[in-house]
Amino acid sequence: MSNFSSRKKSPTGNDLKSARGAELRQQGFQDVNKRRAFLQDNSWIKKPPEEEQDGNYGRVVLNRHNSHDALDRKLIERDEPKATISRYRSEDMLDRTLSSFRTPQSTKTPAVSSFNANTTATASTPATTPVKKKRQSWFPPPPPGHNASPSTAASRRDPALHPPLPPKPCSPIASPKPLGRTNRQIHAATAGACGETERHAERNIRTEDLDDIIRVAAALQKTDKGEELDNLIRMNKSLNRNQGLDGLFRANLKAQQLDKRAQSLESLIYMNTQTDRDGKGNQAFGSLKKINQRADPDRRSQDLRSVIRTHATAERIGRRKQDLDGLIKVNPDTNKNMKRGKSLDNLIKVTPEVNRSNKGGPSLDNFTKGVPARSRANQRDQDLDSLIKVTPSANRSSQHSLDELINTSPQTIKTTARHQDLDKFIKVNPDVLTNNQRNHDVDSTIRGNPTGTRCEQSEELDNLIKVKPSALRNTNGGQDLESLTEVNSHVAEKNGRIDGQANGLTNSLFKESTRASVYSYEARNSLSSNSGNKNGGPKDTVVYTRTYVENSKSPKDGYQENISGKYIQTVYSTSDRSVIERDMCTYCRKPLGVETKMILDELQICCHSTCFKCEICKRPLENLQAGDSIWIYRQTIHCEPCYSKVMAKWIQ
């Protein structure tokens, strides 16, 4: 009673109005932040209004009439019926949030709820005891001290309980999204628990004073000391202290997106953190159920042995001393997507014809087959996997190895004799094979020279195409041309064969390319031999000559053709060789030294002045000075008389 007597003095009406005005301003800031949060997280999307009346109709009606109206109504309005809005009615609050702005009447009532919830944190009993004599002071004109009832009600509390805390100030610049989420989650957690108590308070609202109006929800009376409106959410004791508000409320985003039109604000999921951590218990909605895919014992525990099973037909065929690995082909993509009830026929591919044709103890190599359907169809757009096929006739003769059984094209098997070996199976171009003789081997198909058919089949392919360094250093004129030169694939491009394969050339083009290669080789070989004999150049230097034929003609054609009939030679050599070539005379192959030089970069001529002569009559041109003229016809140096003769031929 000492506590009651010490707090008996009540504030005046103006003080209470100023306190309510501050709370109204604070609640206005919260409404602005709440509206901003609703617009940001798409919680304003609702189903049509004709469908949502039935779900919460009873509670909406109860909250609409005589709810907390005695707190802020004036004396002249006490007998007027007045419908106020509770902050726990999310449906109507969303409707008024989407409107332009709330009316002052609707703005006041959430402040009442804020004051109600703030007072809730300090209460210890389910409801304060009504006082009969104070209840009568609301109906007659009140005495000057009639506002003492809030302090009187507060003075009846047990002095051992917690003192009331002032409301938490909320600035308008606070983060809007956490506030919006907190308000929604508070309502989702406490709406069901507060329903019965609030209905009971609303039935007796006209006969109760301020002490009876401020009701404490049963679910919110057990909160810890010092909690405010933002801290009314109960935390699990097993939860860590440093876990924020986001850790308390974990909703499945996919479930919210799917059911957003059917959800109201009350249906947001409040999940216990211990239940969520265990993955069990009474979780709301079946869509939140977590399935541990790794722990699924039905599908994930299958190993490779349960997937690869021998088919019945494969087991009957495999009795002939055949290895099981040769019969089974597992598709990895099918293995990943396999279901338990799926037939294993899609996993195992057995070639019956290969198994029937195989006798004895064949190895795994004889059973290799790509796609059987494509191999029988003989399609032209087959990839490499569909081109590897086992030849049954070659398989019967068990003396051949695996290399003899690989065929590049299925058409080649049909058009080629059965007794041919690997050289007759591998054809670069099947179309060329039908045009040429069918007994051509691989050497005549790959080579650009028809003389390559004289080469034996046992000769290696590298000896036919690659330039031999030892052959370049040798100056014997009787060497075989085919073992020395390389016909570049650009020859085929210049003659209209864009595919770059030398086997598509005609016989006339083969002859012209051969003559061009001969001329290129002899010219280069003579230079190399001269340098080796006279100047003692490095013996280990290899000069590779690549000839680009622009107009393939032999040198004996003379001057009847135009200038485009010459050759462009590219010399690949070591750095030592290039330095020596620059310091040597082009004609005499001696070091240039400090003597007078004649350098013609276009003709790649760098020689002594005494060696610079007319290439027709061998007349020396060493007396030329700067500004004098020389005549070059078909990249050949002419003196003035020789050039005059050429001009006379043109006039005639």
Curated annotation (Swiss-Prot):
Residues 97-110, 446-455 have a biased composition (Polar residues). Residues 66-95 have a biased composition (Basic and acidic residues). It is found in: Cytoplasm; Membrane. Residues 583-649 form the LIM zinc-binding domain. Keywords: Acetylation, Cytoplasm, LIM domain, Membrane, Metal-binding, Phosphoprotein, Repeat, Zinc. One of its GO terms (biological process) is positive regulation of canonical Wnt signaling pathway. Sequence repeats lie at residues 207-226, 227-241, 242-261, 262-281, 282-301, 302-320, 321-340, 341-360, 361-380, 381-398, 399-418, 419-438, 439-458, 459-477, 478-496. Residues 1-10 have a biased composition (Basic residues). Residues 207-496 are annotated as: 15 X approximate tandem repeats. Its main location: cytoplasm. Residues 111-130 have a biased composition (Low complexity). The modification N6-acetyllysine is found at K82. Expressed in the upper layers of stratified epithelia, including, ependyma and choroid plexus of the brain ventricles. This is Sciellin. It comes from Mus musculus. The gene is Scel.
